[in-house]
Amino acid sequence: METGWPKLDYFFQQLPEQIPPVKEPPVILYHSTFSPSWSAAEILYPEVKRLSQTGEWKWVVTLHPKMNPETRAKFKALENDNLVFSEVDNILELFSDADLMCSDTSSALSEFLLTQKPVVTFNNRRPGPQLINISRVEDFEPAIRTALSRPADLMAEIKTFGAAIHPLRDGKSAERILDAIDDFIARGGKNAKPKPLNLWRKFKLRRAMNYWKR
């Protein structure tokens, strides 16, 4: 049974049926993962600083809680009339006001794509047609402009991607899970066979992210 992800129930309940038009001025959500090998925060910092000072766009910056404290402090110091540094616990709260997201390889970008709004990524580890992925800093501003124009082919890819990873958009995933549990118990279900530890997979993932804390 396909249930969906309960975490997204409230999120889907708040989404409008139609994608709202781009705001004036547009609102850009910038988010970066904490892994030093995957994060583009330091690389794109000068561009975020420069673009936030032009006044053409509004920026909301939020960084992973485990991000290097010095990097967090640098971005927080950028706050001005056009840039807000947000420390909300749940990044989903920022999605509705944003017209697009800029990121790198953060898991949050897949969730943002479920709003059917564009994402610009820098050196994404798994780029695809649903993203505008760049590898040069000088392409950052042009990529944002392209995303804000919402080209039809990109928007179609975003919609296809969203339908593939979470086709159920009614905000009732938790209800389906509870129904599935009740049905499983009613049919005399027993605990499934324990999954293997997958220690090698976990080791490779931690090594790739250079993350060894428990």
Locations of regions flagged by a protein language model:
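Short, conserved active-site loop motifs that form the nucleotide-linked donor/cofactor pocket
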Residues: 57, 81-84, 131-132
